[in-house]
């Protein structure tokens, strides 16, 4: 389906895109006139453009024009050398001739070689009425459609702008959070050094405790030895006491005699 655009958009597209070919399309009206429109084909475009031209009388056969079947009761179309030329839109550039080469010569397709330079336009299957054309044009994009698209683009642009501001604010927040993380990292590093120093102190204290335990163990062994000696001395004292008691008894016996 060709895409319908405005004359202004067509002129802009003609300046920015390379035009490849065009053909004239006619639609039969009830008053015997044809509605002529030029269908342009552009390079690197996935659609064609129909540019409306003013109403023209019935057109006979020509290189780029095909004559359709006559409607019953309609006037006969002239068929002869005196063919009226197609009316041209003043804003529409003439694309029937290609760009001139160096030296002022035209591309092939001039009067010396009429069989070259133009692509043959296929004959339309049938002519359509105004109503049928309007039904088909409903599928084409209109100025209102372009306006809606422009509005959507404006909304998307504003949305992207707002999102860009939000991303900028979030970037500042992330940057501030990064600084906080760096400060926390330094604090954790200092605390780690302190914990490491405390660990060294605890390790030294543990070594001291081990040495004290060893000394306590040695003192315990000495205490045990002293207890054994005290026990032995106690037994010796008991023997001495018993000996003294026996000696006292003997003395008493001797005195009584």
From Swiss-Prot:
It comes from Mycoplasma pneumoniae (strain ATCC 29342 / M129 / Subtype 1) (Mycoplasmoides pneumoniae). Belongs to the UPF0134 family. Residues 80-104, 115-132 have a biased composition (Basic and acidic residues). Pfam families: DUF16. InterPro entries: DUF16. This is UPF0134 protein MPN_013. Residues 49-132 are annotated as: Disordered. Transmembrane segments: none annotated.
């Amino acid at each position: 389906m060709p895409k319908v655009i405005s004359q202004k958009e067509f002129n802009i597209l003609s300046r920015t895109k390379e035009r490849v070919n065009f053909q004239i399309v006619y639609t039969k009206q009830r008053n015997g006139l044809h509605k002529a429109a030029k269908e342009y084909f552009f390079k690197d475009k996935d659609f064609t453009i129909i540019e409306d031209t003013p109403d023209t009388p019935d057109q006979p056969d020509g290189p780029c024009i095909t004559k359709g079947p006559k409607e019953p009761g309609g006037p006969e179309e002239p068929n002869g050398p005196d063919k009226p030329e197609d009316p041209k839109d003043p804003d529409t550039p003439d694309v029937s001739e290609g760009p001139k080469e160096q030296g002022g010569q035209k591309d092939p397709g001039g009067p010396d070689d009429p069989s070259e330079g133009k692509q043959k336009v296929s004959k339309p299957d049938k002519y359509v009425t105004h109503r049928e054309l309007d039904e088909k044009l409903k599928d084409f994009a209109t100025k209102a459609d372009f306006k809606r698209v422009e509005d959507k683009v404006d909304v998307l642009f504003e949305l992207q702008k707002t999102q860009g501001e939000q991303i900028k604010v979030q970037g500042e927040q992330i940057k501030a959070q990064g600084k906080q993380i760096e400060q926390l990292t330094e604090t954790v590093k200092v605390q780690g050094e302190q914990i490491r120093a405390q660990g060294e102190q605890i390790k030294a204290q543990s070594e001291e405790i081990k040495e004290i335990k060893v000394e306590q163990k040695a003192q315990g062994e000495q205490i045990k030895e002293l207890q054994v000696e005290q026990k032995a001395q106690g037994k010796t004292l008991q023997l001495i006491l018993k000996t003294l008691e026996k000696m006292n008894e003997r003395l008493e016996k001797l005195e009584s005699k």
